[in-house]
Curated annotation (Swiss-Prot):
Transmembrane segments: none annotated. It comes from Halalkalibacterium halodurans (strain ATCC BAA-125 / DSM 18197 / FERM 7344 / JCM 9153 / C-125) (Bacillus halodurans). Coiled coil: none annotated. Pfam families: GIY-YIG. InterPro entries: GIY-YIG_endonuc, GIY-YIG_endonuc_sf, UPF0213_domain. This is UPF0213 protein BH0048.
Length: 94
């Protein structure tokens, strides 16, 4: 089973970073108001990036690192092409 870290852009322009084993299911939870407290009332969302990891520990470590980055650093990270984060994906979601 893969473990994912993702970044959502909320309708107010803020970014939310989270962890899940099923990105689609988790975004639906956020959209229904049953996701993280932070995202309630901030939809619709746009999925900005996802990273896949083989273990929960690795994913949780990465989530912690990303959550502690400034917005500018997150934007730089998401815009990277190649390198260790080449599996970053950009998708639109409502």
């Amino acid at each position: 089973m893969n473990h994912y870290v993702y970044i959502l852009e909320c309708k107010d322009g803020s970014w939310y970073t989270g962890y899940t084993t099923d990105v689609d299911r988790r975004i639906k939870k956020h959209a229904s108001g049953k996701g993280a407290k932070y995202t309630r009332g901030r939809g619709p969302f746009r999925l900005v990036a996802t990273w896949a990891f083989p273990s929960k520990e690795e994913a949780m470590r990465w989530e912690y690192e990303v959550k502690h980055l400034s917005r500018r650093k997150k934007e730089q990270l998401v815009s990277l092409k190649g390198g260790p984060y080449e599996n970053t994906t950009k998708l639109s979601t409502t």
